[in-house]
Amino acid sequence: MQVMTTPGRLGPSLATTLQAFHDGRPPGADEDVHMVPAIVDHVIERLSSPGDFVFDPFAGFGTTLQRAVRLGRRAAGIELLPERVEYMRRRIPEAWVTTADARDLGPVLRLFAGTVDLIVSSPPYMTMTHHDADPLTGYEKSGGDYDRYLDELGTVAEQCAQLLAPDGVLVWNVADILHEGVTTPLVDDVATALKAHLSLDAVVPIDWDQLPHDLTADVLLVFRRSLHTKK
């Protein structure tokens, strides 16, 4: 991880624990793919106000949406896997949720372009090697390619920029990964992909008592809508 900038309103770093991560698994979820709820709360409380509109393009099991609703924000999200969409609709009826591919936000843009105050998400991760499953298909298709994955995350970010209000903020949780002896610098690579479409505002490290899985560094990438964002 090389990229550094000022931490802004989130503080210089955030602390959490592996136990908090495990405890934060949504009820009924079959895997740990969520952000730590306390970190999501911190982001939402610091970067939005009650009544603001929060969006998640990789909604998963709905941690961001559930926390946003609990904190008095309006919430919307999309998820590729229909069973997870049904799960969120049952669990968070106050949120707007639909089945969609984050690489094609056209229908969402037609509804919400320029109105989202805060985007909070964690994209599905990929390593540079030993990773045939394609993350942006819900890991359900093979033929994954790391460079294509980064390009497609850039496509997601470009559309997210169009969803943001003029003073809107995007926060993505991204981590470097050590797998099969190879470290994937996902933080730097994702930051580079997003900087083509948004203005980098801060990189906020998350300090764990014990990093989960095979992560070697974990951060929040904070971006603002660029002046050149398409309307």
Name each region found by the language model.
Residues M1-K231:
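Class I S-adenosyl-L-methionine-dependent methyltransferase catalytic core
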